[in-house]
Curated annotation (Swiss-Prot):
Homotrimer. Interacts with TNFRSF14. One of its GO terms (molecular function) is cytokine activity. Keywords: Cell membrane, Cytokine, Cytoplasm, Disulfide bond, Glycoprotein, Membrane, Secreted, Signal-anchor, Transmembrane, Transmembrane helix. The keyword Transmembrane applies. Residues 1-37 are cytoplasmic. The chain crosses the membrane at residues 38-58. Disulfide bonds join 154-187. GO terms for cellular component: cytoplasm; extracellular space; plasma membrane. Residues 94-240 form the THD domain. This is Tumor necrosis factor ligand superfamily member 14. N-glycosylated. The soluble form of isoform 1 derives from the membrane form by proteolytic processing.
Amino acid sequence: MEESVVRPSVFVVDGQTDIPFTRLGRSHRRQSCSVARVGLGLLLLLMGAGLAVQGWFLLQLHWRLGEMVTRLPDGPAGSWEQLIQERRSHEVNPAAHLTGANSSLTGSGGPLLWETQLGLAFLRGLSYHDGALVVTKAGYYYIYSKVQLGGVGCPLGLASTITHGLYKRTPRYPEELELLVSQQSPCGRATSSSRVWWDSSFLGGVVHLEAGEKVVVRVLDERLVRLRDGTRSYFGAFMV
């Protein structure tokens, strides 16, 4: 009896077996993930840089606030007022206002003398010597002067006009230099020898003055100058 032999079915496919097998779509997904990671890294880097810059500015602000606190006075309110006054003193410009006094009329032909402390008079950043305002800081100054004039009739021996002027003394020139001058005649106002007349002369203008230069007021025939409580005749200057 013959043995039955079972033979498996074998299918042989003849073809090229050296072609590599590749899976579609895998490399494209890897490239997309790499780009996303790079973008996320750049975003995190920018956020870190922004936080670092913000921290630096906050640290600078903290240091500056500490410096300001150390400069502030620790005393009472008077210290604050003193600090404010000191700061204002550095900011204000030189100024002076001088008033007429009984000693203004020297009778010697020199410049008029002035009160520097009493009443409305003050000096700030300028000095005073023998009727002259002495400039301590070069610059442009508005200088002014007013004198009250008065008398009875036409004064004997009076020239044709009364001269009221502001003059500058400078080391660079031996004589006084005219800055502002006014001339007027009171005799035209006095129609009779017994009539009382009043008048005033005001001068004001901007001039350039150097440190060390002086400004004085002169009135030819000063016996006509009238003084009263420092409001009728005065002299001053301030930097502009």
